[in-house]
Structure formats: C-alpha cells, structure tokens
Amino acid sequence: MKPLIKICGLKTPEAIKVAIDNGAHYIGFIFFSKSPRNLSIEEAKQLRPLIKKPVKLVAVTVDADDEMLSKIIANVKPDIIQLHGHETPERVKHLSGTFGLPIIKAFSIREQSDFNEVAAYRGLVDMFLFDAKAPEGSQLPGGNGISFDWSLLKTLDEDCQTVLSGGLNAQNVGEAITIASPDILDISSGVERAPGVKDIKLIEGFFDSVKKAVEN
C-alpha cells in the first residue's frame, strides 16, 4: 500500500505549492520558537489559504499550553494537532476534550524499550508518530535529520495509524517503506538545503523516490 506523505516545516508559498502539486496529503506548520522552521501565528495565518481540502494542515507543537493552542486553532484553523513534546496521557486527554481535533502524538525512538510508553496513549490519539531520539544537547525534539532502526516498528502491535519520521530522504525512503510499512511518511530536514530552508528540487525528488519505491 502506498503511504501518505506529510511535508513538515514549510514556511513559504513556493514550497507549499510544490509539496501539494506533487501529492502531499499533509502539510505541517511548526509552532516552536527554538526551531529554524518556526512560524508565528500571523505568518501561518497568511499561508493557511494555500492549503485546501483534501490536503490537511497539521499544527506541530511542543509542550504548548492551552492559551497558545487556542490562539493557533482560532487563527490558523489546523485540521490536526501534533504533540511533539512530553505531553502525558492525561494532558492528551484534556486537549482532545477541550479542542476536539484529531491528535498525532510523537515518540522518540532509539531502542525497543522506547516503545513501552506507547500503550498508555492507546485510544487517546489518532496517529502515533515515531521519530529518532534527539542527539545529546539538541534543543529540537525533531527535525534533526537522524533515523532509528526502522525494523523496530515491525514489533509494534497498535491499532492506530503510524507516521514514520526522522532522517528520511530521497535516497533511503524506499528502504524505509520496505522495512517499516508506515501509513504515513513525514519528512522535513531531508528536503532542505539548509536548516529551515526547503529545496524545491529535493521535494520533487522525494516524491519521485516514493513513487518508484511503491511501483517496484
């Protein structure tokens, strides 16, 4: 089955257009001040009209409080909220009840035991996102351009959509699809020429690689 594709950390109309024209199913806006891909709410609001259904907008947040989430939702109107911090199951349940939007919960993976916390979120979220654990000293929970052992996902027994993130690019995405069989591929730094700067050719190349991998 061909995985869906999420392009994350887009900041310009040109990059958004190329991603959508090539078949992106999800566009991710990042609301985290420490990230080179961060957008202000006003910037995101200006870009929002470029994303039309059936493409869905994902608001990526890191331990955001209710006030910030309320502002994002009121102004940017995302279709989905991604929680990429240390949000507890109780926090996720609160956010789901408060805002009523589908939720993606990100988990940082390096080894098999890192999957242990996933079970506590069963039934609370709509998608599980698995990213490589950030290197020591990094201020970014994601978008670091590193991957984890994708074969670990084969042991996951969860009735929930899986999103594979971390270190994906045009060169390795075929292998990632073969090994992990994710429902959704999530790429950010793998289509950048510099941190936070998306490259049109790299975006196009990634989609071409996914197409070839699925056809073979």
Regions found by a protein language model. Give the residues of each.
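Conserved N-terminal beta1-alpha1 strand-loop-helix module at the mouth
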Residues: 1-184, 189-216
